[in-house]
Amino acid sequence: MKRQLLLACMFVVMTGLGAPAALALDRGAVAPPLLLRGDAGNVAVPAIGAKLTWVDFWASWCGPCRKSFPWMNEMQERFGAAGLTVVAVNLDAEAADAARFLQEVPANFLIAYDASGDSAQRYGVLGMPTSVLLDAEGKVLLRHAGFDRDDAPALEAAIRKALARDVAP
């Protein structure tokens, strides 16, 4: 019952309050900077010193999030040295739920926590997972809702293209 109530509340918050912010985060818009609690201190979005930040909003009850984490691990490993930083923002109300998820689906990238959901509202998140690719200045390069392995090639291509553009004179 508690879980169903939490899901219903999150749905209302995500759809009701997030809609206006979604319009502000179209491609080319500057995303609001975030400073969130992480396991080893504060986590900044966009990530400090990163050429690109992949921001992923997730929750422990999100089925597609379980599929996206291994892919994000791959992207961090493959492109981290080139300047990509993956930041996954957990929106669970209970920290223990996120901890259980992370025991089952490990993350080799930064995890930030926002039980209030304020960051999701500011980024116009309407469902999970929702991912946003930001350049070093916080400009939105890509916004993607959901995750399926079939999405992976196009998402990776967007990361490659953005990194190549950053390197070009």
Residue ranges and their predicted role:
Residues R66-V105, A115-Q121, A157:
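Structural microenvironment flanking redox-active thiols in thiol-disulfide oxidoreductases
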Residues G18-A24:
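Boundary at the C-terminal end of the N-terminal hydrophobic targeting segment
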Residues M1-Q4:
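Positively charged n-region of N-terminal signal peptides that target proteins for export
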Residues G49, R100-N108, A115-R160:
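Thiol/disulfide oxidoreductase modules built on the thioredoxin-like
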Residues K51-T53, F57-W61, G127:
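Short pre-active-site segment immediately N-terminal to redox-active cysteine/selenocysteine motifs
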Residues A8-G18:
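Bacterial N-terminal signal peptides
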Residues P33-T53:
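A short beta-strand-turn-helix
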